[in-house]
């Protein structure tokens, strides 16, 4: 039996639309991510468990884990009879890389079960392909950090899909999921087809400056440059209370904040534990909309997807 855990991730990080993402893990030790188990069997089967299992498609072939198994078998050129179990701990359409968690855990578990026939680069390419079936286009800003850990910059040149960017140990990521769903496809459709020249220049300056600040170890500068002129101005209308929440967490002391992925999760970066707790308390009282919402104080998950049992 192989059991793989794949962590939540926060894509875009305001400054890097479709090209930056970070894997995150709660500081209290909770597992914020999906778990997939693979066991040898006579025929294929898929069982769904976990807090958000009831939100998965009722038709097994529509489940992304089934599609991962099917695509992995196609890649190897043979049918691999296994019993798979998806522990769905991540809310769907949350902006926390929910589909990426399932895809990464499923493909990594299949690869481990079969003796690692695929290298990490090929496996990551498959992960991007499968995640793209849900989001509507292939992009790696969730699957890459989820699989490899840390903060990842998408390269997609010279057979390099992504490379790690150094993060800051003092940064605490407060993630607030309000309990509502935002479709990634819908959040992409709301974006303009073309952008003004000054917005393109600002975006390039912010992203280049952010990467420079990470490598030159300037956390204050990095946080200041986490600005979004590409998606947030258009997507915030999909997120009730987002603008007020951003203003509130800034007043409390967050050094940066924005939309995690395509939302509705809000992320707020803090450089002090007491500030992070105050931000988390405010968001828990004011940004959550129902019982399914949650707030976690997290750090970067530098390990990425990992085998829990083998």
Curated annotation (Swiss-Prot):
Catalytic activity: L-homoserine + ATP = O-phospho-L-homoserine + ADP + H(+)
GO molecular function, one term: homoserine kinase activity
This enzyme's EC code(s): 2.7.1.39
Keyword entries, A-Z: Amino-acid biosynthesis, ATP-binding, Cytoplasm, Kinase, Nucleotide-binding, Threonine biosynthesis, Transferase
GO BP, sorted A to Z: threonine biosynthetic process
Pathway: Amino-acid biosynthesis; L-threonine biosynthesis; L-threonine from L-aspartate: step 4/5
Sequence positions that bind ATP: 91-101
InterPro entries linked: GHMP_kinase_C_dom, GHMP_kinase_C_sf, GHMP_kinase_N_dom, GHMP_knse_ATP-bd_CS, Homoserine_kinase, Ribosomal_Su5_D2-typ_SF, Ribsml_uS5_D2-typ_fold_subgr
Effect of residue 203 to L: 2-fold decrease in kinase activity but nearly no change in substrates affinity
Pfam families referenced in this protein's UniProt entry, alphabetically: GHMP_kinases_C, GHMP_kinases_N
Gene3D superfamilies recorded: 3.30.230.10, GHMP kinase, C-terminal domain
Coiled-coil residue spans: none
UniProt cross-references to NCBIfam families, sorted A to Z: PRK01212.1-4 (NF002288), thrB (TIGR00191)
Function: Catalyzes the ATP-dependent phosphorylation of L-homoserine to L-homoserine phosphate. Is also able to phosphorylate the hydroxy group on gamma-carbon of L-homoserine analogs when the functional group at the alpha-position is a carboxyl, an ester, or even a hydroxymethyl group. Neither L-threonine nor L-serine are substrates of the enzyme.
Family, as annotated: Belongs to the GHMP kinase family. Homoserine kinase subfamily.
HAMAP family: Homoser_kinase
Name of the protein in its database record: Homoserine kinase
Species the sequence originates in: Escherichia coli (strain K12)
């Amino acid at each position: 039996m192989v059991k793989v855990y794949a962590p939540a991730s926060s894509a875009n990080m305001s400054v890097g639309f479709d090209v930056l993402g970070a894997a995150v893990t709660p500081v209290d030790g909770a597992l914020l991510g999906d778990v997939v188990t693979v066991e040898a069997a006579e025929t294929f089967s898929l069982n769904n468990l976990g807090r958000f299992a009831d939100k998965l498609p009722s038709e097994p072939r529509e489940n992304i884990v089934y599609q991962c198994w099917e695509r992995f078998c196609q890649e190897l050129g043979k049918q691999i009879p296994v019993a798979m179990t998806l522990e769905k701990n991540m809310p769907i359409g949350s902006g926390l890389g929910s589909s990426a968690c399932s895809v990464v855990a499923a493909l990594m578990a299949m690869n481990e079960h079969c003796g690692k026939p695929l290298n990490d680069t090929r496996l990551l390419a498959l992960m991007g392909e499968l995640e793209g079936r849900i989001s509507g286009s292939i992009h790696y800003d969730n699957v890459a950090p989820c699989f490899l850990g840390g903060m990842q910059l998408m390269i997609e040149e010279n057979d390099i899909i992504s490379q790690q960017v150094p993060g800051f140990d003092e940064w605490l990521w407060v993630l607030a999921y309000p309990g509502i769903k935002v479709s990634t496809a819908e959040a992409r459709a709301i974006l303009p087809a073309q952008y003004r020249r000054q917005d393109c220049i600002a975006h390039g300056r912010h992203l280049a400056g952010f990467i420079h600040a990470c490598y030159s170890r300037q956390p204050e500068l990095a946080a200041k440059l986490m600005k979004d002129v590409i998606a947030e101005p258009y997507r915030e209308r999909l997120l009730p209370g987002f603008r007020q929440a951003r203003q509130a967490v800034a007043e409390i002391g967050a050094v940066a904040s924005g939309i995690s992925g395509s939302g509705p999760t809000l992320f707020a970066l803090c450089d002090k534990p007491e500030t992070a707790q105050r931000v988390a308390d405010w968001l828990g009282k004011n940004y959550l909309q129902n019982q399914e919402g949650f707030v976690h104080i997290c750090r970067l998950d530098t390990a990425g997807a990992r085998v829990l049992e083998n």
